[in-house]
């Protein structure tokens, strides 16, 4: 059952993404599978511009930004033990996990 598993992690907090990636890599390595990563993917920055005043002063604006951080982990030569370990793994609620087999 040797197959490639690709895990993408996405979050607004880079510390959560790094901790989750570290946890996944450590868990997979204990099962004996080969891991590449975590590979940092480009950071996406979304910028919001709003008026400071609700009525006048178009020149007075404020900008807010939301950064999303992504990491990629590839797992090779995985076994059923690896998949079971990944299913039981508890990750923080602020991390979005996408798994492709």
From Swiss-Prot:
Alphabetically ordered keywords of this record: Ribonucleoprotein, Ribosomal protein
Pfam family, one: Ribosomal_S10
Lineage top rank: taxon: Bacteria
Single GO cellular component term: ribonucleoprotein complex
Stored InterPro entries: Ribosomal_uS10, Ribosomal_uS10_CS, Ribosomal_uS10_dom, Ribosomal_uS10_dom_sf
GO BP annotations listed: translation
An annotated Gene Ontology molecular function: structural constituent of ribosome
NCBIfam families assigned: PRK00596.1, rpsJ_bact
Similarity annotation: Belongs to the universal ribosomal protein uS10 family.
Assembly notes: Part of the 30S ribosomal subunit.
Protein role: Involved in the binding of tRNA to the ribosomes.
Protein's name in the database: Small ribosomal subunit protein uS10
Gene: rpsJ
């Amino acid at each position: 059952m040797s197959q490639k598993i690709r895990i993408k992690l996405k979050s607004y907090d880079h510390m959560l993404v790094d901790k989750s990636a570290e946890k996944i890599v450590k868990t997979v390595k204990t099962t004996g599978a080969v891991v590449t990563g975590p590979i940092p993917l480009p950071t996406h920055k979304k910028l919001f511009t709003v008026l400071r005043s609700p009525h006048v002063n178009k020149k007075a604006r404020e900008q807010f930004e939301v950064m999303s951080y992504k990491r990629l982990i590839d797992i090779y030569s995985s076994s059923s033990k690896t998949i079971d370990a990944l299913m039981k793994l508890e990750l923080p609620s602020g991390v979005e996990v996408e798994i492709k087999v």
